[in-house]
């Protein structure tokens, strides 16, 4: 029995901006369903492997195509958001994306379309996690996730 004291080094290893599907994945898989603003949750190496695998499955099964989709835009005359149809590059089949990495609406969370930005967030996730997993000292680290909005 004694006074044991520790100082830990914390380092950011991945960053996302408005990648709400990734946030929703962490909520479902690491945060017991919901994470509050700035709330930390533990992330294991196996969690990182699963997230990477889920992203790769969606990327492999999907193709971007041009399609008319409803989007919300601000109408300065009406001084409100209105729904309009716009041509966007979106996934031709969203079924696997909706199952493994569904988007999540939120005031600061960005678009919920399964579009080019969605695909880019999955590609960035795969790249970031690949780099993390390649670190020879990975088993010495502990990981946590939190989001700020």
Where are these regions (language model features)?
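Acidic (Asp/Glu-rich) sequence patches and key acidic residues
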Residues: 1-149
């Amino acid at each position: 029995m004694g006074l044991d004291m520790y100082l830990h080094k914390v380092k950011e290893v991945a960053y996302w901006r408005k990648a709400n599907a990734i946030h929703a994945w962490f909520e479902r898989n690491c945060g017991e369903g919901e994470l509050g603003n700035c709330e930390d949750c533990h992330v294991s190496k196996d969690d990182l492997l699963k997230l990477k695998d889920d992203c790769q499955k969606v990327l492999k099964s999907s193709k971007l195509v041009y399609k008319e989709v409803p989007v919300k835009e601000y109408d300065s005359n009406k001084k409100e958001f209105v729904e309009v149809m716009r041509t966007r590059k979106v996934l031709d089949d969203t079924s696997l994306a909706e199952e493994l990495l569904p988007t999540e609406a939120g005031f600061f969370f960005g678009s919920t379309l399964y579009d080019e930005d969605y695909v880019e967030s999955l590609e960035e996730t795969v790249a970031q996690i690949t780099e993390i997993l390649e670190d020879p000292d990975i088993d010495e680290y502990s990981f946590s996730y939190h989001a700020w909005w």
